[in-house]
Amino acid sequence: MKILLITSIYLPHIGGIELYVKNLAANLIAKGHEVSVFVGDRFVKKISDSVEYGIKTIRVPVFYFKGMTYLRSKAGRKILEKELSSVEVVHLNDVKFLYKFLAQKKSIYGYKLFFSSHGFIFHTKSFLFLKKLYMKRMSKYSGFYDLNYCVSENDLKIAKDFKFSNLKMLIPGCDVKKFSVIDPNKFEKNVFVCFGRIAKNKGILELVKLFNSCSFDFFLKIIGKCDDDAYFQKISFIAKNDSRIEFLGYKTDEEIKDSIQAAEFLVFPSLHEGFGLTLVESLSSGKKIIANKIETFTQILTDCGLPEFLFDFSDDKNSLQVKIEELRKLPTRKINLEKYSVEYMSDVIERGYMGM
């Protein structure tokens, strides 16, 4: 099959959607399908068509406003429609980008149409009323999609609340062996590592505030890129006078592995997640984790038999210190994560594409 995956955020940015799209594309290619990735990229000024990570990738400039993403030019739309006219399957990965457009074009070009939720639009509570109006409007087009994949129980509930149709629950797959080479019993004491995309919903500001208030010895390393300058300035203002907190910026996978190996604890302070792919990948390291007690993380860690890794980041510094000491008393262990594997996920999606 000829397949087009569409996203508004992609590598080299670090995050769950980016990895989901790349992993899905790579696995479908390995199965013999012809796959391209179409990216509405607000950080590029020119249209590009190249091979990235072994995958044909088309990047077009977009206009980004209040979380919404729109194609900026007729040239970008023309290229998209050319791709739509030649594929059998289209798979969208952002409800804020082309959801209505792809539904309207389906009858013209005759492709099968799929969607993955990735938290929908509710990563923060800002503009909540407008977000609800938008979701209500988009739900009218959900019936044009052969399947709307919900990546978590929370997303499935949201979809049902807004009366989306053609729903299927499917946990995103990831590289469940990504950090398996790491020895969980080798670490530098009091080193905490947080990695991934830096954004408001990731809870980095709250993380820095909490650790900054702590009097015990620690070294917090934060890996990732922030595209919101105003938000990053708020974080930096608190952290700049605390030598225990260090921002390392963007790092390669190998560099991230080195940082994880050195860490005593991995920290996931997210306020909201569509799924939590980075958390699942990190479980393959066997390292002890401190993850915010949000619905998605609770679902994953409870399912994996690791509820002790949950912590309410709204608690105070004393509670954090208690949690750290509790975790230090527990043995390290690696668990079987095969049901979260990208191979399993891509098999299910491939069958969906085929109507099975």
What is the role of each PLM region?
Residues 19, 190, 194-213, 230-233:
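A conserved mid-protein helix/loop that constitutes part of the nucleotide-sugar donor-binding site
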Residues 48, 157, 221-244, 255:
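Short, structured helix-loop element that forms part of the nucleotide-activated donor/catalytic region
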